[in-house]
UniProtKB/Swiss-Prot annotation:
Gene3D superfamilies documented for this protein: 3.30.420.40
First-tier enzyme category under EC: transferase
GO process annotations (BP): tRNA threonylcarbamoyladenosine modification
Necessary cofactors: Fe(2+)
Protein name: tRNA N6-adenosine threonylcarbamoyltransferase
NCBIfam families for the chain: gcp_kae1 (TIGR00329), T6A_TsaD_YgjD (TIGR03723)
One MF term in the entry's GO annotations: iron ion binding
Keywords: Acyltransferase, Cytoplasm, Iron, Metal-binding, Transferase, tRNA processing
Cofactor note: Binds 1 Fe(2+) ion per subunit.
Source species of the chain: Streptococcus sanguinis (strain SK36)
Disulfide-bond pairs as recorded: none
Binding site for substrate: 136-140, 169, 182, 186, 275
Catalytic activity reported: L-threonylcarbamoyladenylate + adenosine(37) in tRNA = N(6)-L-threonylcarbamoyladenosine(37) in tRNA + AMP + H(+)
Amino acid sequence: MKDRYILAFETSCDETSVAVLKNETELLSNVIASQIESHKRFGGVVPEVASRHHVEVITVCIEEALAEAGISEEQVTAVAVTYGPGLVGALLVGLAAAKSFAWAHDIPLIPVNHMAGHLMAAQSVEPLEFPLLALLVSGGHTELVYVSQAGDYKIVGETRDDAVGEAYDKVGRVMGLTYPAGREIDLLAHEGQDIYDFPRAMIKEDNLEFSFSGLKSAFINLHHNAQQKGEVLSNQDLSASFQAAVMDILMAKTKKALEKYPVKTLVVAGGVAANQGLRERLAAEIQDVKVIIPPLRLCGDNAGMIAYASVSEWNKENFASLDLNAKPSLAFETME
């Protein structure tokens, strides 16, 4: 059988990434051009700046991905691309590049949901057994997803306000940390003590919804009041207390979901899945099901995960026409 090569594009936020996947399982290249340094001084991603950076580096990323994979343009058999959710201008850059490549080589164009990419990055660890449950935690999303089969995703619980990664960045800014703050807070948390009693919203409610705005507000108020009194609080203890509250919420809701939906596998994915505190809690508290977390290099935004998610769409011949447009608010369906 002829080898199949998927060329995948990811430009939903502030990473420009192009990857090559061979025969559904072998990731030959995963080139990522990060823009973090450009956005640090703003304390967050500036959409216009992100779009311009994507335009500047996308062609080089394509060339590097193909060279690293050791294949020519003519050997590519399909193109996969993130079409949402994300920043509209950023998405359009990846879409333009992907559609141009697919048109020029007369090969299928596969549309991929960015969050499906995060989830299916777990496929890089081992073949996934369905049905499974996924906890997706990132800068823009916090959701529990039931996956009956590859490509069939249903939200069973999600945040009512802030995403967990967003909360990390906001409290990080209050502590004077650089953007993005998640990794630094995780490191500080391991050096501090959980001495502040932050709220764990909705933790006892019999649903699978999350809320982090109350926790974020309590953190900001504590820090602000201390500043007004001239007190200096330890960033280590603040981080440890904040992270403990976040993990208590995530673990409580995940355990409830596993009780409601008996599955054999739990996938934990998204940028926050790189958090060591979360990985430690999962290892200590989830023993009855197999927990699969993508490797660190596939937790953040990258095109490799988009390639993995595109496989099920390709097998179903779920191809897009060249008028495929960006869907910045694209979301999984909610379980009825």
